[in-house]
Design a protein with these regions (language model features):
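Active-site proximal loop and beta-alpha junction motif in alpha/beta enzyme cores
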Residues: 1-185
Length: 185
């Protein structure tokens, strides 16, 4: 739990599935909105306040082996009620600097699979379907459990649809002394 200025006490789960997310279940919190397009601005504003509140107070966001992943990427609001579409759950991912994902978020679904497996909500091989704010669907399952170093983990499988939205061609001049890239830190 965390107290977020202007919102109040927020109950959330923290999980990693390629990035760290705060999973905020609507049933465990009191929000004046639901997960619909009409409330996207409230979702963004609230999601960013929660993310910033957690980042400013929760110093437990530490990846055990990759220091550059020691941050909260976003807030995922979840509604675990069966949806009219037939999906098991609906979620909205507010990430980065206030963007909303068009899909249920692959890394977010991976983290949710870990949460559901930890709570014994599902067994290996059980399939859950997740719907996004746009209506797109991902399916997730846990295919195995294993140790990641000394940490319990799951190997999730996520299935969804992706669409090509553009193409890019990069070129470099062979005389460019940093044509292979550079990094400043």
């Amino acid at each position: 739990k965390i107290i977020v200025k202007g919102i109040g006490t927020i109950t959330y789960d923290l999980a990693y599935g390629g990035a760290f997310y705060a999973y905020v279940d609507l049933a465990k919190n009191d929000f004046p909105f639901d997960l619909t397009k009409e409330h996207y601005q409230q979702l963004i504003n609230t999601g960013m306040k929660i993310k910033n509140g957690i980042m400013n107070t929760d110093h437990s966001i530490k990846h055990p082996y990759e220091e550059d992943l020691n941050f909260l990427y976003g807030t995922i609001f979840i509604d675990n009620n069966k949806q009219a579409s037939g999906s098991d759950s609906k979620n909205v991912c507010v990430f980065a600097e206030g963007e909303v994902d068009r899909c249920p978020t692959g890394s977010g679904v991976s983290g949710r699979m870990a949460i559901h497996k930890m709570r014994c909500d599902l067994d290996i091989g059980d399939i859950m379907t997740f719907e996004s704010i746009t209506g797109s669907i991902f399916k997730g399952t846990v295919i195995s459990e294993q140790l990641y170093g000394s940490f319990k983990s799951v190997i999730p499988q996520v299935e969804g649809t992706a669409y090509i939205t553009g193409m890019q061609t990069f070129v470099f001049d062979p005389k460019d002394s940093i044509k292979n890239g550079f990094m400043l830190r």
